[in-house]
Amino acid sequence: MSAEVDTNIPKENVPEEVVEAKTTTTTTTMEPEPLIVEDLKSTTIESTPVKIGDPTSNEQIAREEPKPTITEPSTTKSVAAEPTTEQHQETAVKLESVKEADAEAAARVESTEDADGEKALSTSQPSVSFDKTTKTHDGSPLSKFFSELPEILKVAGHNEMWGIILDPSEDHVQTSIVLEKFLRANTKDVTKAKAQLTEALKWRKAMQPQKLLVDTEFDKVKFGKLGYVTSYPTSEGGKEVITWNIYGAVKDTKKTFSDVPEFLRWRAALMELSIRELDLASATEKIPENGPDPYRMIQVHDYLNVSFLRMDPGIRAASKETIQTFSMAYPELLKEKFFVNVPMVMGWVFTAMKIFLSADTIKKFHPLSYGSDLGAEIPGIAEKLPKEYGGKGEELESGFTVKYSGDDVPKSD
């Protein structure tokens, strides 16, 4: 997972004002000549408002400057008389006076432009305050989500997500990463993202997954060699983080999966270890609003020698709970997910996932019949992968894992 106020305030389309000049008639009536005054803007002139296009404004101008006499049009057809040279001169003088008044009004418009802009802003874009330390949002989904954050934190009673203390200030990079991920998981629907974030924060408050990673020692017999985290440098200067679940390492399915809450705690601790490798808490770049998300990981589930997943109800319950909880608590952290050495009887797993995950997430899933095919799917780091996954790198046991009681398996940093 910064917005600025839009100062491009729309201005009123001011129509051209037509001032008709007519001479005073004696025995004949002169046809009126249109005098065009162009591009006049609405303005406020000192204590008396004068607005072009407003009848009262024209009267104000008339009081200040001489104006041609306006006569009511006759109901009968008039015969136009050829204006005299004196009449032309009189009309020109009056037109010049009107132009001078218009120039003065235009100068006053220029001098009050900033004040008028601020007034228009206050009426067309009402500000929304988060608190004393935050900025007015710009109307984008992310900015609106920021405006909801204080209420979310109050309702949840918790302000930590993935090692990040959430901050309502829109310039807080790490918070923007979290919010953007929850938005993308909900197709930019702020209301849905707000509900999910609130639920995720409540879950973290109860589960305390970071403490599970740091303080808890898990049962080696139940979970030993079941999960690892590896990190490989890329040619672009970044790194590819992979979480591995080696289900073939399970020796006693009932011990490992029968206690679903215990399995979920172990799995959450492993997930927190993966997130730590992503360095979200120290990130300095926001996720581009409509660009690729660089803060994601790869997951690999290996089912080599697994022949017990089709019917065992305990395993199904653990899998269902994990999928449902993680889709809520860890949205948009998955770049791709590979299921390797998948037997045909594992079809029910993919069916279960479709119930809780979005179509876009399902597209990230890639079942592979053989583990050695994995390297071809991740060519950028293929050679760094363990041999059984198509590479030439170190074994998984050299990677990171959670703490286990009474053994010397690799520990998390």
From Swiss-Prot:
Membrane topology: Peripheral membrane protein
Catalyzed reactions: a 1,2-diacyl-sn-glycero-3-phospho-(1D-myo-inositol)(in) = a 1,2-diacyl-sn-glycero-3-phospho-(1D-myo-inositol)(out)
Residues in CRAL-TRIO domain copies: 222-397
Biased composition (Basic and acidic residues): 85-111
Recorded GO MF terms: metal ion binding; phosphatidylinositol transfer activity
GO cellular component: cortical endoplasmic reticulum; cytosol; endoplasmic reticulum membrane; plasma membrane
Sequence positions that bind heme: 247, 267, 301, 303, 337
SUPFAM superfamilies reported for this sequence: CRAL/TRIO domain, CRAL/TRIO N-terminal domain
Cell compartment(s), UniProt: Cytoplasm; Endoplasmic reticulum membrane; Microsome membrane
Entry cofactors: heme b
An annotated GO BP: Golgi to plasma membrane protein transport
Region Disordered, annotated ranges: 1-141
InterPro entries: CRAL-TRIO_dom, CRAL-TRIO_dom_sf, CRAL/TRIO_N_dom, CRAL/TRIO_N_dom_sf, Sfh5
Function: Non-classical phosphatidylinositol (PtdIns) transfer protein (PITP), which exhibits PtdIns-binding/transfer activity in the absence of detectable PtdCho-binding/transfer activity. Regulates PtdIns(4,5)P2 homeostasis at the plasma membrane. Heme-binding protein that may play a role in organic oxidant-induced stress responses.
Protein name per UniProt: Phosphatidylinositol transfer protein sfh5
Gene: sfh5
